[in-house]
Amino acid sequence: MKQFNYLSHKDLAVVVGGRNNWQTNVGGAVGSAMIGATVGGTICGPACAVAGAHYLPILWTAVTAATGGFGKIRK
């Protein structure tokens, strides 16, 4: 398993914006919450709608971060 890389203050100063702008990020999070609520509500009602609206944006955030959508480091 790969070890974590720690960034110094100097390294953090060269972090640039990601591929997404804030509108894309807000739209993605809201859209994933709506889809999660719809799919969860269809499967087993209000309880699953709440769970879907909560957990799908978390999954969307993890996938977006893992694929570099939030930012990259300039070398």
Curated annotation (Swiss-Prot):
Key word Metal-binding present: no
SS bond partners: none
Pfam families associated with the record: Bacteriocin_IIc (PF10439)
GO biological process: defense response to bacterium; killing of cells of another organism
Keyword Chaperone in annotation: no
Propeptide: 1-18
Keywords associated with the record: Antibiotic, Antimicrobial, Bacteriocin
Family: Belongs to the bacteriocin class IIB family.
Summary of subunit composition and partner proteins: This bacteriocin depends upon the complementation of two peptides for activity: LafA and LafX. Associated with a 180 kDa bacteriocin complex.
Described function: Heat stable bacteriocin active against Enterococcus faecalis and other Lactobacilli.
Protein name: Bacteriocin lactacin-F subunit LafA
Lineage, broadest ranks: Bacteria, Bacillati, Bacillota, Bacilli, Lactobacillales
Gene it is expressed from: lafA
